[in-house]
Amino acid sequence: KSFALLYPYSIPLYRRLGWEIISNKMTYVIKDTQVPQKIREPGYVRRVAWDDQDFKLLHGMFAAKTHGCLYRNKLAWEEYFRWDEDDTVVAIYYTAKDVPTGYMVYMISSDILHVKEMIYLDREAQLGLWEYIHKHDSMIDEVRGNNYYSEPIAFELDDSDIKETIRPY
C-alpha cells in the first residue's frame, strides 16, 4: 500500500483538518571540547564515493527500523544530496570484520563540522563515528548536525550542556 506524506506550511491548520506530524527533526550544536574523546572502537572509518553500495544499503537497513525514515529510491538519493556532492564527504564505519554498520555525510567549513546525516545500526558504529569526529578536533571549533528524534545526542556526552532543537518534520 502507498500513502502520501507532505510537509505542511501550517501545522495548526492541518491538525484541524485531521492530519498529524509523524516525525521530528533534531538539530544540535556541540563545542569541540564536548565531543567524546576516550573512545576506542575496534572498527575503522573509510571515506567512500557517493555511489558506494554500502552507503545506500546501510540507509535501507536504517530506514527499515526507524520511525519516519523513508526509503530512498534513485530519484530520492539524487534530490536529497543534489547540491552537496562536491562539498561533502561520505564516511562509513566498518566493524573489525569489515561489516558496514554506520555512516555519516559531513563537510568542514569555517571551523565547523557540519553533519548532514549520521546513521548507525548499533552502538559500536555510533561510538566509532564519534571517534572519527574527534579525530578532526584540531580542524574544528564545533559540530553542527541533524539527527533523528529517536537518537538523542546529549545523553551520550560527558558534558551534555549542548544546544538541541526539536522541530516537527
Located regions from the model:
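Intrinsically disordered, low-complexity, positively biased terminal segments
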Residues: R40-Y169
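Contiguous, non-catalytic segments that form substrate-binding/exosite surfaces or channel walls
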Residues: Y28-Y44
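Conserved active-site alpha-helix within GNAT-family acetyltransferase domains
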Residues: S2, Y7-M26, G128, S150-R167
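Residue-level detector of alpha-helical recognition elements and their boundaries
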Residues: I21, Y28-V29, I92, R144
